């Protein structure tokens, strides 16, 4: 019987830092998307300039992206910082529960699929009853069907 694999306690701080860094990068990206969409409605030329700038810089490092944006357009950089902070304040309360629930649901689905594959269950999809009953029987021929319709 395989033992359950768990992260070692000394790995948790590193994993937490890496996760937080990734989340900050993602929130920076989302803030830029929100602002780009707002600008598209109010200032299409500004939205285009933000799109062009964003294509030149990677969101893999949100802080480097933000530093470059602040050098390029201070007002826009400050706006990204404000929106990013606002997003963080509103989603982080719900994130732990949502993340755990999604992981648990995904794990159940993966385990179910694995079990079905290992046991051979679900290998052949069954047809709904209506499709089965609408099919002509194997012994019926096209001539039988036309004769039955003209039997009146």
Curated annotation (Swiss-Prot):
Q: Which GO terms describe its molecular function?
A: protein folding chaperone
Fetch the SUPFAM superfamilies from UniProt. Answer: RbcX-like
Chief location: other
Query: How is this chain's protein used, per UniProt?
Result: Heterologous expression of 12 carboxysomal genes in E.coli (ccaA, ccmK2, ccmK3, ccmK4, ccmL, ccmM, ccmN, ccmO, ccmP, rbcL, rbcS, rbcX) leads to the formation of bodies that resemble carboxysomes, have densely packed paracrystalline arrays and RuBisCO activity. These structures open the door to generating carboxysomes in plant cells to increase their photosynthesis and productivity, as well as tailoring bacterial microcompartments to specific metabolic needs and molecule delivery. The absence of ccaA, ccmK3, ccmK4, ccmP and rbcX leads to less active RuBisCO.
Q: Where in the cell is it found?
A: Carboxysome; Cytoplasm
Q: Give Gene Ontology CC terms.
A: carboxysome; cytoplasm
Question: What's the superkingdom here?
Answer: Bacteria
Q: Where is the signal peptide?
A: none
- How does a null allele present? Non-essential, no visible growth phenotype in ambient air or 2% CO(2), no change in RuBisCO assembly or activity. Non-essential, has a reduced growth rate in 5% CO(2), about 2-fold higher amounts of RbcL accumulate. Cells have fewer, larger carboxysomes, their positioning is often abnormal. A double raf1-rbcX deletion partially recovers carboxysome formation compared to the raf1 deletion alone.
Q: InterPro entries per the record?
A: Chaperonin_RbcX_sf (IPR038052), Chaperonin_RcbX (IPR003435), RbcX (IPR046381)
Please provide the record's keywords in A-Z order: Bacterial microcompartment, Carbon dioxide fixation, Carboxysome, Chaperone, Cytoplasm, Photosynthesis
Chain positions covered by the region annotation Disordered: 121-152
* Protein's GO biological process: carbon fixation; photosynthesis; ribulose bisphosphate carboxylase complex assembly
The function of this protein is: An RbcL-specific chaperone. The central cleft of the RbcX homodimer (RbcX2) binds the C-terminus of an RbcL monomer, stabilizing the C-terminus and probably preventing its reassociation with chaperonin GroEL-ES. At the same time the peripheral region of RbcX2 binds a second RbcL monomer, bridging the RbcL homodimers in the correct orientation. The RbcX2(2)-bound RbcL dimers then assemble into the RbcL8 core (RbcL8-(RbcX2)8). RbcS binding triggers the release of RbcX2. Colocalizes with RuBisCO throughout carboxysome formation, suggesting it plays a role in caboxysome biogenesis; may also be involved in RuBisCO holoenzyme stabilization or adjusting its packing in carboxysomes.
Similarity comment: family membership: Belongs to the RbcX family.
Q: What's the miscellaneous note?
A: Unlike most cyanobacteria, in PCC 7942 this gene is not encoded in the rbcL-rbcS operon.
Identify the HAMAP family for this entry.
RbcX
Q: What is known of its domains?
A: The homodimer has 2 functional domains, a central cleft essential for production of soluble RbcL in which the RbcL peptide binds, and a polar surface which plays a role in correct RbcL subunit arrangement.
Q: Which PANTHER family match?
A: CHAPERONIN-LIKE RBCX PROTEIN 1, CHLOROPLASTIC (PTHR33791), RUBISCO CHAPERONE RBCX (PTHR33791:SF1)
Q: Describe the subunit structure.
A: Homodimer. Interacts with the exposed C-terminal peptide of RbcL via its central cleft, contacts a second RbcL monomer via its peripheral polar surface.
Name of protein:
RuBisCO chaperone RbcX
């Amino acid at each position: 019987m395989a033992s359950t694999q768990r992260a070692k306690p000394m790995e948790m701080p590193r994993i937490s830092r890496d996760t937080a860094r990734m989340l900050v990068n993602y929130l920076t990206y989302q803030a830029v998307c929100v602002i780009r969409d707002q600008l598209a409605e109010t200032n299409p030329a500004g939205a285009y300039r933000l799109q062009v700038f964003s294509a030149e810089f990677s969101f893999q490092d949100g802080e480097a992206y933000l530093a470059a944006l602040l050098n390029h357009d201070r007002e826009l950089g400050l706006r990204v910082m404000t929106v990013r902070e606002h997003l963080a304040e509103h989603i982080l309360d719900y994130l732990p529960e949502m993340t755990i629930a999604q992981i648990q649901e995904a794990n159940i689905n993966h385990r179910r699929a694995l079990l079905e594959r290992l046991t051979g269950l679900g290998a052949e999809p069954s047809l709904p009853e209506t499709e089965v009953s609408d099919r002509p029987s194997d012994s019926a021929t096209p001539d039988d069907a036309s004769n039955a319709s003209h039997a009146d």
